Amino acid sequence: MHPKLDILILAAGKGTRMRSDLPKVLHQLAGRPLLGHVVATAQALGAARTCVVYGFGGEAVPQAMAEATLSFVLQAEQHGTGHAVKQALPQLADDGVTLVLYGDVPLIHTTTLAPLAAAADAGKFGLLTVNLAHPDGYGRIVRENARVARIVEHKDASAAERAIQEVNTGILAVPTRHLKRWIGELRNDNAQGEYYLTDIVALAVRDGVEIETHQPQHDWEVLGVNSKAQLAELERIHQNEVAQRLLADGVTLMDPARLDVRGSLVCGRDVTIDVNCVFEGRVELGDGVQIGANCVLRNVSIAAGTRLDAFTLIDDATIGEAGRLGPFSRIRPGTRLARDVHVGNFVEIKNSAIDAGSKINHLSYVGDTTMGQRVNIGAGTITCNYDGANKHRTVIEDDVFVGSDTQLVAPVTVGQGATLGAGTTLTRDAPPGELTLSRAKQQTISGWKRPIKPKKEG
């Protein structure tokens, strides 16, 4: 906790180039709004308070971030970054320091920001700059005798100033008492007719406040999002960072460029992940887990030694040790699979508990079911759990064998060791240890002829 650090996040921009009705800062990167990434960074820095200045989209921004401990200030009309900061000044403690961040710059690291806050703590002006080979569009850092003298916006810069490659990122930290004074002195006599926050640099120089510059470890940390193309670019940068961390932790990625983690992914030892897999929410993979190609996992815990074949979808479920799932399996919310459970191709399981050693290998639907150990479910089996108004549970006890093409009309219980013959429609409980079946008597109609379609003339 940094008891005197206030973080101000500017998030009022419309984002015209996004071509969207959604406020720019609410567009998602890695499964989280852009603003959410910045808020998480602020929280990691231990700020005493975090204030978000919002504008376009009205209350959509505060509503989207309602779970975070934030204060919000509306910038009803956008007249530049200096004007945005002015709206929030009453929220900032005079005896603290203020770090200014941007809601559309989501990849900034805490290790980059910490030195800026430390500079402000020491009474200095902490300024984040970066050197770019092609600095078009950015404000230039003008130095005199190696010291920062001012920042000139691109549209206001002379030819000589446009040749400067050190540019302003907009991210800064200053003692709040200075910030409040300088903001009151800003003028809008520039090409844009706006109040530039960057103009406080010249005021700091005038007042003899030392400007201490720092640069990020990676240039992409300060990249902003103004278009869908830039959003896609930052998504790939972020996913590459995630992939590199996983590789460093010993995870085998068949292709690091074809991985999407949209939340948190925690892996044990010797985990292997094939291409085009998506991980959403919180996903935990135990030792030796193998994930086949094109799987989607959302809020899932998978125990050691389990293998998922291609195109398996698991959502809000727990998978036990040494399981085998897929290909083309769907595990829906509320499902718990115990050890050594096999779920095969085109099987869907919802809100069910499947105990150890049971197998559902082909073309089946199991919903709202409690299944014991060592159960074998034949191909084409359906638990009919919904009567049009209510859902009912099916109970299948240990060591049951269910023949293919069987329907179990819930509520119904199949006793321990029972066998259901193929094609059975079970509407009453099946007793333990017995064969239960229901089917029409087979008959052969002698002399029956299949209808023949008449041949077309010509």
From Swiss-Prot:
It comes from the Bacteria. One of its GO terms (cellular component) is membrane. Residues 229-249 are annotated as: Linker. Pfam families: Hexapep (PF00132), NTP_transf_3 (PF12804). Coiled coil: none annotated. Its EC number is 2.7.7.23, 2.3.1.157. It is an enzyme of class 2 (transferase). It catalyses: alpha-D-glucosamine 1-phosphate + acetyl-CoA = N-acetyl-alpha-D-glucosamine 1-phosphate + CoA + H(+); N-acetyl-alpha-D-glucosamine 1-phosphate + UTP + H(+) = UDP-N-acetyl-alpha-D-glucosamine + diphosphate. It is found in: Cytoplasm. Its cofactor is Mg(2+). Residues 250-458 are annotated as: N-acetyltransferase. Keywords: Acyltransferase, Cell shape, Cell wall biogenesis/degradation, Cytoplasm, Magnesium, Metal-binding, Multifunctional enzyme, Nucleotidyltransferase, Peptidoglycan synthesis, Repeat, Transferase. Its main location: cytoplasm. Signal peptide: none annotated. UDP-N-acetyl-alpha-D-glucosamine binds at residues 10-13, 24, 75, 80-81, 102-104, 139, 153, 168, 226, 332, 350, 365, 376. Acetyl-CoA binds at A379, N385, Y386, S404, A422, R439. GO terms for biological process: cell morphogenesis; cell wall organization; lipid A biosynthetic process; peptidoglycan biosynthetic process; regulation of cell shape; UDP-N-acetylglucosamine biosynthetic process. The active site is at H362 (proton acceptor). Pathway: Nucleotide-sugar biosynthesis; UDP-N-acetyl-alpha-D-glucosamine biosynthesis; N-acetyl-alpha-D-glucosamine 1-phosphate from alpha-D-glucosamine 6-phosphate (route II): step 2/2; Nucleotide-sugar biosynthesis; UDP-N-acetyl-alpha-D-glucosamine biosynthesis; UDP-N-acetyl-alpha-D-glucosamine from N-acetyl-alpha-D-glucosamine 1-phosphate: step 1/1; Bacterial outer membrane biogenesis; LPS lipid A biosynthesis. Mg(2+) binds at D104, N226. In the N-terminal section; belongs to the N-acetylglucosamine-1-phosphate uridyltransferase family. In the C-terminal section; belongs to the transferase hexapeptide repeat family. Homotrimer. Catalyzes the last two sequential reactions in the de novo biosynthetic pathway for UDP-N-acetylglucosamine (UDP-GlcNAc). The C-terminal domain catalyzes the transfer of acetyl group from acetyl coenzyme A to glucosamine-1-phosphate (GlcN-1-P) to produce N-acetylglucosamine-1-phosphate (GlcNAc-1-P), which is converted into UDP-GlcNAc by the transfer of uridine 5-monophosphate (from uridine 5-triphosphate), a reaction catalyzed by the N-terminal domain. This is Bifunctional protein GlmU. It comes from Thiobacillus denitrificans (strain ATCC 25259 / T1).
